[in-house]
């Protein structure tokens, strides 16, 4: 297969960074197609740990071309910081490419994100306050500023003036806070323009040419299926589309160019922020998973809510993404549990349902229907083939395949690249 889309099947934080890094070794291009710096991924190379939020994980391979596609919203300040961070760590960024059509996050987006969240009171949705939502809102309203606009001084000046007139009016008259200085923002962003300029290009053409020439392209999704604007637990979602179908729009390729879709699924379930979570564990088992899995957000540092594996969610993600394979992560975290539960359905109004409900009111009233499986105590972090795993661990994986109807192709048993079991080659 020459093109692979890698997506998260849960609420994000599934371990996509590690799997992307692992698959990037065989890819020629690694492409981010949606989201912004609200998505954090951690990659461990040997004894070194790299935390990235915007630049694709493939940047750690110096010969790979890494693309920030048109579907991504870019905070130039964060981009500058990540470029400097990587250079200080000895990582070259020469092969980074940025879409001319990508939209920019402006300081007023971040301020509005913060104020709007505070204004919701008890109805907060758990935004990261990075300005992602307001930036996508401007994109949909056709008032956003793109990379190509920033690189044209006159056009940028015109668009910034129009935006500031509206945004300062909103900040000052509705929220009662000070607006932004045109001169300060203009000169700050002109500096960013010169940082971005060497990387800016028509990435759609670049990616399509690569596919046509037989090169291997990995599309890296951010967040997860249940944070998708259409298919997630709305309104507790992100402002973009983490599902596989968005790779076409966010990278500028046609759907016939996609050959494989791999869903990254954690061996249990986690969530950051507000919203229903049927299998959430508020007991010592939940705390065990949080500590063993070090479940704290890369972007926010917030402790993640933890729960048992939810087969209803996994089955739903398999359908809306058209998954051809699964990559199961953090299997090692379950080591030491005597009994492991998997939700195979929900009980709602006295009936068992097998489909993920659209209504959050319904979802909040759903109780998980569990199947119990025996756990294992053996250390599996050194396993490199399926037969190295204890029988109970293999049975657990078979159950996931049975529930989802999707074959497992990759199993992660630790944070390092080498702590990976390959059942079927993706590239």
Curated annotation (Swiss-Prot):
Binding sites annotated in the UniProt record for GTP: 12-18, 40-42, 304, 330-332, 412-414
Top enzyme category: ligase
Binding, IMP: 13-16, 38-41, 128, 142, 223, 238, 302
Segments traversing the membrane: none
Subcellular location, record wording: Cytoplasm
GO CC, any one term: cytoplasm
CC cofactor: Mg(2+)
Domain of life of the source: Bacteria
Protein's pathway: Purine metabolism; AMP biosynthesis via de novo pathway; AMP from IMP: step 1/2
Annotated substrate binding sites: 298-304
Function, in words: Plays an important role in the de novo pathway of purine nucleotide biosynthesis. Catalyzes the first committed step in the biosynthesis of AMP from IMP.
Protein name, UniProt field: Adenylosuccinate synthetase
């Amino acid at each position: 297969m020459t093109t692979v889309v890698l997506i998260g099947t849960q609420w994000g934080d599934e371990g996509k960074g590690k799997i992307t890094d692992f698959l990037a070794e065989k890819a020629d291009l690694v492409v981010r197609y949606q989201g912004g710096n609200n998505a954090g991924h951690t990659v461990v190379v040997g004894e070194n740990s790299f935390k990235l939020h915007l630049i694709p994980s493939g940047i750690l391979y110096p010969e790979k071309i890494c693309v920030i596609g048109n579907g991504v919203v870019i905070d130039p300040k964060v981009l500058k910081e990540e470029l400097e961070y990587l250079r200080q760590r000895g990582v070259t960024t020469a092969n980074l490419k940025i879409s001319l059509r990508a939209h920019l996050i402006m300081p007023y987006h971040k301020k509005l994100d913060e104020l709007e969240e505070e204004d919701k009171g008890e109805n907060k949705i758990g935004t990261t306050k990075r300005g992602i939502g307001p930036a996508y809102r401007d994109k949909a309203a056709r008032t956003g500023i793109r990379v190509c606009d920033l690189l044209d001084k006159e056009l940028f000046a015109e668009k910034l003036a129009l935006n500031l007139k509206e945004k300062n009016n909103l900040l000052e008259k509705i929220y009662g806070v000070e607006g932004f200085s045109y001169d300060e923002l203009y000169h700050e962003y002109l500096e960013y323009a010169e940082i971005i300029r060497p990387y800016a290009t028509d990435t759609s053409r670049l990616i399509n040419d690569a596919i046509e020439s037989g090169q291997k392209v990995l599309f890296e999704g951010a967040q997860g299926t249940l944070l998708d604007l259409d298919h997630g637990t709305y309104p507790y979602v992100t402002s973009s589309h983490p599902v596989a179908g968005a790779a076409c729009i966010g990278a500028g390729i046609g759907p016939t160019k996609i050959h494989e879709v791999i869903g990254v699924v954690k061996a249990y379930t986690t969530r950051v922020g507000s919203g229903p979570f049927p299998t959430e564990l508020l007991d010592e088992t939940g705390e065990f998973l949080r500590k063993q899995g070090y479940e704290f957000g890369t972007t926010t540092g917030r402790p993640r809510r933890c729960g048992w594996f939810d087969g209803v969610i996994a089955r739903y993600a398999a359908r809306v993404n058209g998954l051809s394979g699964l990559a199961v992560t953090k299997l090692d975290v379950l080591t030491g549990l005597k009994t492991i539960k998997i939700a195979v359905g929900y009980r709602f109004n006295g009936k068992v349902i097998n489909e993920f409900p659209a209504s959050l009111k319904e979802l909040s009233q759903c109780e998980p229907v569990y199947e119990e499986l025996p756990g294992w105590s053996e250390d599996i972090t050194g396993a490199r083939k399926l037969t190295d795993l204890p029988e109970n661990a293999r049975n657990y994986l078979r159950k996931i395949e049975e529930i989802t109807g999707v074959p497992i192709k990759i199993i992660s048993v630790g944070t390092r690249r080498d702590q990976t079991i390959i059942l079927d080659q993706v590239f």
